[in-house]
Amino acid sequence: MASVHLKYLAVNPVDLKWGTAVNSVGFQEIAPGMDYPPRNHPSRYVFSVASGRILQEYQLLYITEGKGKFSCETLGRSKSIPVKGGMMFLLFPGEWHSYYPDKSTGWKEYWIGFNGAFVDNLVQQGFFSKDRPLFKVNIHEDIVNLYTSAINAAVAQESGFQQVLAGIVDRLLSLAYFYDRNSQFQESDTANKISQAKVMIHSHYMTISPEEVAAKLCLSYSSFRKTFKEYTGF
């Protein structure tokens, strides 16, 4: 895909009532050694890597190739966090941030910028937080397809396109949360143990106790209960 940056998307009061309004969406490929941001970066979003910037919107970025660094106010301006292909990060309105690709690799990035009460509520409820802005999601075709669909909808700008974009933002946030959460559990073998527990409970739900399930998994009951609740929500 050629680099595409769509700026100043039309947003009207009805769009805001929907709960999410999209301001910008796009894709760009930064080749190794290329300046960042590129010189054709829209003035509304231009920034210096050294000085960073503050936006008045959320942006969800997805890096599909390459590597680089990310910094934000909450985690510390002097702290550069490694970013690589298969990671997403969320920028928050009013939050200083800076990010850039490694000169040796460049990177490919998708992004979508948005505002609205829907996302504000997710932040207020603790699903997304300034102190956890990065997500390990790996490379997924469904995420790439969503960004591509958003770009196509924004190019066409047919009647109701903002509502289509709002639905895509919802789905992208859901997948960022889902893939990152499961990545954390898989790294600690939690997913495997919980899967075993669910099979035991399903097969012997009339005769097996939670304490027995914990014992078969070589876990203390308190540890099993805590882990099961974190994974399933129950």
Label every PLM stretch briefly.
Residues 139-142, 189-197, 232:
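N-terminal positioning helix adjacent to the helix-turn-helix/winged-helix DNA-binding module
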Residues 207, 211-234:
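Basic/polar phosphate-binding segments, predominantly the helix-turn-helix DNA-binding elements
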